[in-house]
Amino acid sequence: MDNHGVDPDYFLSEVHKLDYSIIGPNIDLNEELKILEGRKIIYTNANLQHTVDVLEKLQLTNMFTDIFDIKKANYIPKPEISPYNQFIKDFNIDPESTIMFDDIAKNLVPAKNVGFTSVWIDAGYENFSDDIASSKKYLDYETKNISNFLNQVNKGEI
């Protein structure tokens, strides 16, 4: 955005003008997040408004203590390492006791490098096979369903 003289807030507000009507409540995820111990913070390359809009549609707004959006990351997107370090600092996070979930495998490489446990959510649309192949060694877990994965965590199976 800097290279093209575009205001990042304006750009992100335009990019996130989406039809949210296809998103519905995720009751299973809601239940698993209620049970899951510890702070739950969203780290996203999206802006705050888009994130809140999606959380509202999923009925998950009360599940998270905070949101680290692209603006808080100084408009530096994942997988750049500096925002991960900022995230750790801003929220006083112990990386060794933190799990990061992402649906883009390469975003978990720096997460693993700073000490997080990494979980790739294979949503079936990742078409960067080279990124997945080169990221595999950084993925502690893979799942196709975050609710089922959290259910296993909550039961102590993982």
Predicted region positions:
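A metal-dependent, Asp-based hydrolase signature
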Residues: 1-17
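Short, solvent-exposed polar/charged micro-motifs at secondary-structure junctions
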Residues: 2, 21-23, 151-156
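Short glycine/proline-enriched coil/turn segments at helix->beta-strand junctions
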Residues: 3-7, 36-40, 114-116
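Exposed alpha-helical structural elements
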Residues: 7-11, 28-32, 148
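A short hydrophobic/aromatic micro-motif that marks alpha-helical segments and, especially, helix-coil
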Residues: 9, 20-23, 95
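Short, acidic loop-to-helix structural element flanking the phosphoryl-transfer center
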Residues: 15-42, 47-52, 81
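Asp-based, Mg2+/Mn2+-dependent phosphohydrolase catalytic module
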Residues: 34, 47-48, 52-158
